[in-house]
Amino acid sequence: HATEVARQYGISVWIYDENSYPSGFAGGHVPADYPDSFNQGQGLELERATQLPEDIGSVFLCLLRENDSWKDITEEMTEYAGETGDFYLYRKTYYEKGDWYGGFSYVDLLLPGVTEKFIETTMRGYEKQVGNQFGKTIPGIFTDEPNIVTSGGLRWTPDLFEQFEKRWGY
């Protein structure tokens, strides 16, 4: 209805991409339709240590800095327990479920298929309802920035290291 009235008055209508901030989860529809899109760990939180603790707990990745190089000691962390050095311990962080995310958590925007599911869920609905006005009364659709909170950490997705090595060769 709004698009038709705007057309009659010569007013442009800009469509917001979805339900709420941040963009990418379509008000909970993306995680509902694509369960693999959330809670695989969306970040890696860094803890630096000069002595590797005896109880490493939920460490996902452990790097030892030696001079100007890095050594991945994740597989043999227990052998280094109690030793001193320049250790970088990373733990997975997870978005919490909440009402803001439609009862789900935020999605992993780096996971293949998430963007496609978002477009299918949101843009196809707009196209069906008012697609004949795209480029006319509706000059465009705008989006919010994604939620990539990783203060003190790294943005992460399950195949990050594999893709990095494939792209950069190391």
Indicate where each model-derived feature is located.
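Mature extracytoplasmic enzyme cores
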Residues: 1-170
